[in-house]
Curated annotation (Swiss-Prot):
Cellular localisation: Cytoplasm
Name used for this protein in its record: S-adenosylmethionine synthase
Gene behind this protein: metK
Binding site for L-methionine: E57, Q100, D242, K273
Binding of K(+), residues: E44
Record-linked PROSITE patterns: ADOMET_SYNTHASE_1, ADOMET_SYNTHASE_2
Main localization of the protein described in the UniProt heading: cytoplasm
Protein source organism: Acidithiobacillus ferrooxidans (strain ATCC 23270 / DSM 14882 / CIP 104768 / NCIMB 8455) (Ferrobacillus ferrooxidans (strain ATCC 23270))
A Gene Ontology cellular-component term: cytoplasm
Alphabetized Pfam families for the sequence: S-AdoMet_synt_C, S-AdoMet_synt_M, S-AdoMet_synt_N
Family: Belongs to the AdoMet synthase family.
Catalytic activity: L-methionine + ATP + H2O = S-adenosyl-L-methionine + phosphate + diphosphate
Region described as Flexible loop: 100-110
EC class name: transferase
Length: 389
């Protein structure tokens, strides 16, 4: 008898206030890296009615107009009118930015501190995950949740649904049988809108223009449930509806609740922060393990101590799907991947202004040319090393 269960993941649009904050923080990071690839950045953003607050620690030689970077990010997202409740041109921007602590810097700088190699920017544990449910080796629920919010932004910006506004959320519930995705059980999509669109017209348009083009027909069945703006009205949204903060959508950013999470956010952090760079490396490792056919499902944990270059631990878990022992796969990882902070930065070419694009619709499962952690260029090497033919 087959074993059945439901699993749900959510996504939020680029206009969700927490994602606006993430995008501002990563736009600041990109502006610095474009001039100073070795800049140290921990940029935090708060956004609320009529106000953006920029805080954090930044050490750089770059000259950046942080307020303008924040405003232009909000403009690109689409909050361009007081009628929406937030206007990029008239909002206030408050800055309180300090330099990185020299005590932290000496542990990170190569040639300084007790470990003369580049050390980790903090202690912590990070996870990477991959599975063979989709072509991009991501879990099905989060993959389609992201595609729905991406589609909402597309049809808003290209004028097909001009009454849409930037804030939106999606949620996809998938039915699994014997741990394989077989059907979509429930779709939730809530989108901000202009006040003059009726609920009935909105529901029809969202279903036809956003949901149907995204979800595969073979996963839809007669009992699939669609909950579109289930409160009935979503006019007040964005930073007016909720205060946004950097780093509050860490499950949306990763695997939608499948796999584990070490707790560290990504946006606004330069790659010397292992919260970000090691999570990207973990995805790179896990994806190559699955792409190599060593497992159908794989989670990698790596942990660090501040100022120390070598990881303090490495764990591989294939959830019983591995074709060789997990310990053997972990040994192959140590042999073929350099998981020191400096090694990760070089391996994935992370000292580039590539991060604003990561800050909405997921850091993983998007095969953009800049997303080097999505490559599967180690798969053949791993397969050969494992003795698979």
């Amino acid at each position: 008898m087959s074993k059945s269960h439901l699993f749900t993941s959510e996504s939020v649009s680029e206009g969700h206030p927490d994602k606006v904050a993430d995008q501002i923080s990563d736009a600041i990071l990109d502006a610095i890296l474009a001039q100073d690839p070795r800049g140290r950045v921990a940029a935090e953003t708060l956004i609320t009615t009529g106000l953006i607050v920029l805080a954090g620690e930044i050490t750089t030689t770059a000259v950046v107009d942080y307020a303008d970077v924040a405003r232009q990010t909000v403009r690109r997202i689409g909050y361009n009118s007081s009628d929406m409740g937030f206007d990029w041109a008239s909002c206030a921007v408050v800055q309180t930015l300090d330099k990185q602590s020299p005590d932290i810097a000496q542990g990170v700088d190569e040639g300084a501190g007790l470990d003369l190699d580049q050390g980790a920017g903090d202690q912590g544990l990070m996870f990477g995950f991959a599975c063979d449910e989709t072509d991009v080796l991501m879990p099905t629920p989060i993959y389609f949740a992201h595609r729905l919010t991406e589609r909402q932004a597309m049809v808003r910006k290209d004028g097909r649904l001009p009454w849409l506004r930037p804030d939106a959320k999606s949620q996809v519930t998938v039915r699994y049988e014997d741990d394989r995705p077989v059907a979509i059980d429930t779709v939730v999509l809530s989108t901000q809108h202009a006040p003059d669109i009726s609920h009935a017209d909105l529901v029809e348009a969202v279903r036809e223009e956003i949901i149907k083009p995204v979800l595969p027909p073979e996963m839809i069945h007669k009992d699939t449930k669609y909950l579109i703006n289930p409160t009935g009205r979503f006019v007040i949204g964005g930073p007016v509806g909720d205060c946004g903060l950097t780093g509050r959508k860490i499950i949306v950013d990763t695997y939608g609740g499948q796999g584990s999470h070490g707790g560290g956010a990504f946006s606004g952090k330069d790659p010397s922060k292992v919260d970000r760079s090691s999570s990207y490396a973990g995805r790179y490792v896990a994806k190559n393990i699955v792409a190599a056919g060593l497992a159908r499902r794989c989670e990698v944990q790596v942990a660090y101590a501040i100022g120390v270059s070598q990881p303090v631990s490495l764990m591989v878990d294939t959830f019983g799907t591995g074709v060789i022992d997990d310990d053997r796969i972990a040994a192959l990882v140590q042999e073929h991947f350099d998981l020191r902070p400096k090694g990760i930065i070089q391996m994935l070419d992370l000292l580039r202004p590539i991060y604003a694009k990561t800050a909405a619709y997921g850091h993983f499962g998007r095969e953009e040319p800049e997303f080097t952690w999505e490559r599967t260029d180690k798969a053949a090497v791993l397969r050969d090393a494992a003795g698979l033919r």
